Regions:
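Active-site and adjacent substrate-binding regions of carbohydrate-active enzymes
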Residues: 17-575
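Short glycine-enriched nucleophile-adjacent loop
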Residues: 12-16
Length: 575
């Protein structure tokens, strides 16, 4: 049955041998700079492959390294076939792929094909002749009564339509005006995209993380909708939700590209209904997997993240558990607590009392052993945190600046707006990687493109490599446990069942191997009070703990068939 359900392939090796793998996202600009220009580069990544291998990483997701003006940090691509000069050369990229293969590691790249850069050759030709063939590569529409064709708001604020000077034509951009949306209705565009994808596969990569892919299908009537803000605009999501038939595009792309190379694909997909899961990540789904963003949507208020409510533990736990339950008979999700678009998990998901090494380890264990493929974002493995900034000028991120202005326009004080940025800005995840306690955290000998978090003197790789009780050491143990031969079947294919949901601030669940009967309890106490949990029977073994020794836990457990967890305690028990 498992073979029938999980028979897709992954970068040339069958998924039955790959679902136990661990992935790691690298944001190249902030990983490691080797030439002193303040920007991370491919040679920096190559130099740290042994570090990643020793951590237990099998798959590396590389955020965009293509040629770009970097209006949106590389998600505005001006040439899909070139490496941005600041990252190095194509020879450097080829070396990276080769060195990863030597270590049995796989590289997946970012695929950004909902839009390109306004500096891309296609768009420049479209602007030169808005009625010519290249205009058909994008969405150009006539204005109405001197206004934009419809009232959509882009993700980065302002109208999603920008006027072409000297004409009455507007082009659509669901992101920044420098990121015009590609017209997927045009078969020539699709063909060129597929050719590009296959070109990268021929260079030896194993797959793609697919950016904003739901956006490629538009409602071609581009109707206006009732405004959802004082600006008279409505989120472009409203238009996208009214579009139908995206599956046709996704299946064609899969057939023309991914299937030919047994590729691993992970989709950036939001707001799927439960009855759509199989279409996207089932046995014959559009993608191998997708990220679980159920917790991400809790971080938004009515007008973005500046007015987001404080994270509610019960809502967060319920969101993750609901995803786990929905996936059981369908496929695998990619589990994350951080990425380049999110604040740091150590700050975002942990209450104030748990923002310490014990709390970070607890968060790691409780998410990492869920059913699905775990992704780690650079710096997460050492517990990097959000960074306090004193002025909006210290931020680089385009969406952060938009949300800051939105907060001020809504009547928030400068202090409140900056605090919202501290809590939610994407730049929190983009500060330089903290390698050691030297100047700039060992990231660069120059001036970093984005100022480092000052806590690099206390939170850094070198310090934690030398401490067996560090967060980094705990992640190594966690990865080793998930891959251990005696438990790998349970952690990879075992069922999920929530546990102790009636206990306040308890994040607990069972992973069960239905073939062997092996049953494992994962439990973390996110609250401030000590909690005693009754067990079905005394535990057989403590597989991992972030605090008390295994002997202490088992002694108490065998005396009363119960588990005592203090604040921030987490434990993995073989029952």
């Amino acid at each position: 049955n498992r073979i029938a359900i999980w028979g897709w392939s992954f970068g040339g090796f069958n998924t039955l041998m790959s679902n136990d793998k661990v992935a790691y996202q690298i944001y190249p600009k902030s990983f490691l700079d080797t030439n002193g220009d303040g920007v991370g580069d491919l040679k920096g990544i190559i130099s740290k492959l042994n570090y990643l291998k020793k951590l237990g990483i099998d798959i590396v997701w590389l955020s965009p390294v293509y040629e770009s003006p970097f209006v949106d940090q590389g998600y505005d691509i001006s040439d899909y076939y070139k490496i941005a000069e600041q990252f190095g050369t194509m020879d450097d990229f080829d070396t990276l792929v080769a060195e990863m293969k030597k270590r049995g590691m796989h590289l997946i790249m970012d695929l950004v094909v909902n839009h390109c850069s306004d500096k891309h050759e296609w768009f420049q030709k479209a602007l030169a002749d808005p009625d010519g063939p290249y205009a058909g590569y994008f969405y150009f529409r006539e204005g109405k009564d001197g206004k934009a064709p419809s009232n959509y708001r882009s993700y980065f604020g302002g109208s999603a339509w920008t006027k072409v000077p000297g004409t009455n034509k507007y082009y659509l951009h669901t992101f920044a005006k420098e990121q015009p949306d590609l017209n997927w209705e045009n078969p020539v565009v699709r063909k060129k995209i597929y050719e590009m994808i296959n070109w990268w596969f021929e260079k030896g990569i194993s797959g793609f993380r697919i950016d904003a892919i739901i956006n490629i299908k538009k409602n071609l009537d581009f109707p206006s909708f009732p405004a959802d803000g004082d600006d008279g605009l409505v989120s472009c999501d409203k238009m996208l939700a009214s579009a139908h038939g995206i599956g046709t595009f996704l299946e064609e792309m899969k057939h023309e590209t991914f299937d030919k190379y047994d590729a691993f694909t992970v989709g950036e997909v939001f707001h799927l209904k439960e009855d759509e899961l199989r279409e996207f990540i089932g046995e014959d789904g559009h993608f191998s997997t997708k990220f679980d963003f159920s917790a991400h949507v809790l971080s938004y208020g009515e007008h973005g993240w500046y007015d987001a409510p404080a994270l509610d533990f019960n809502r967060w736990r319920t969101a993750l558990f609901d995803t786990q339950k929905a996936d059981l008979t369908v496929g695998f999700e990619a589990n994350i607590i951080e990425n380049h678009d999110e604040p740091r998990g150590a700050t975002h998901y942990l209450p104030a009392h748990a923002r310490n090494e014990a709390g970070v380890k607890m968060l790691a264990a409780t998410y990492f052993l869920l059913r699905g493929i775990p992704f780690i974002y650079q710096g997460q493995e050492i517990g990097m945190t959000n960074c306090v900034r004193n002025d909006i000028s210290e931020y680089d991120d385009i969406s952060t600046k938009d949300q800051y202005l939105a907060a001020l326009n809504a009547g928030c004080s400068k202090e409140a707006a900056l605090h919202a940025c501290y809590e939610n800005s994407r730049d929190n995840a983009r500060t330089p990687m903290q390698w050691d306690n030297s100047l700039h955290g060992g990231f660069t000998t120059g001036t970093p493109w984005l100022a480092e978090n000052p806590n690099y003197t206390k939170i850094n790789v070198t310090d934690q490599l030398n401490r067996p009780d560090s967060v980094l050491s705990f992640y190594k143990e966690l990865i080793a446990l998930r891959k251990a031969p005696e438990y790998v079947e349970t952690f990879t294919y075992g069922t999920f069942a929530a546990a102790y949901e009636d206990v306040d601030h308890m994040f607990a669940y069972y992973r069960t191997n239905e073939e062997t009967g092996q049953r494992i309890l994962v439990a973390g106490n996110f609250g401030t009070d000590t909690v005693t949990l009754p067990l079905e029977k005394p535990a057989d073994r403590v597989l991992l703990t972030n605090g008390k020794t295994a002997d202490v836990i088992l002694t108490r457990n065998r005396e009363s068939a119960s588990l005592v967890l203090g604040s921030c305690d987490c434990v993995v028990l073989l029952l």
